[in-house]
């Protein structure tokens, strides 16, 4: 599993961190003895604060809010908030759908239809195992939409 390094920070200002998350790294709550991205970034911010104020004792934990997540096996880009104001604004963007998320995947098989295809599923989250599963429509599941468009067709993979 790849860990976190300084080069994984794609953009940083006073309000946000935009970070490349490697496949295999948990965003939060990694198993005991494993580093997750949230704590790696907290360590980075604490080290940065110590470097900016040498000789001063730093006991305050830096503020960092997870704005959205990616599953542990998924590689991608995440946005973290560095203060409460940014966390509130970014959280509203996630909630009202103005923050756009895109996923790219390599799939096996043939896509029959051209253009954008829309899939509707119903998901139930299991908090104990931190997993979600697809359930039948009309059950307790929350609706989830996936829009799929083939960008490229590769032969003989």
Report the location of each language-model feature.
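RNA pseudouridine synthases
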Residues: 1-149
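Single conserved hydrophobic/aromatic residue that forms the stacking wall/gate
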Residues: 147, 152-157
């Amino acid at each position: 599993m790849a860990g976190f390094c300084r080069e994984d920070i794609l953009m940083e200002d006073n309000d946000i961190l935009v970070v490349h998350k490697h496949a295999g790294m948990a965003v939060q709550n990694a198993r005991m003895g494993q580093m997750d991205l949230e704590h790696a970034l907290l360590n980075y911010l604490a080290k940065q604060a110590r470097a900016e104020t040498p000789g001063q004792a730093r006991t305050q934990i830096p503020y960092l809010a997870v704005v959205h997540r990616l599953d542990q096996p998924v590689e991608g880009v995440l946005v973290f908030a560095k203060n409460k104001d940014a966390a509130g604004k970014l959280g509203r963007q996630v909630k009202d759908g103005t923050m756009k998320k895109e996923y790219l995947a390599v799939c096996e098989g043939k896509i029959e239809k051209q253009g954008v295809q829309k899939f509707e599923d119903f998901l139930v989250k299991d908090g104990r195992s931190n997993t979600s599963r697809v359930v039948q429509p009309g059950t307790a599941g929350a609706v989830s939409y996936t829009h799929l468009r083939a960008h490229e067709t590769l032969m003989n993979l």
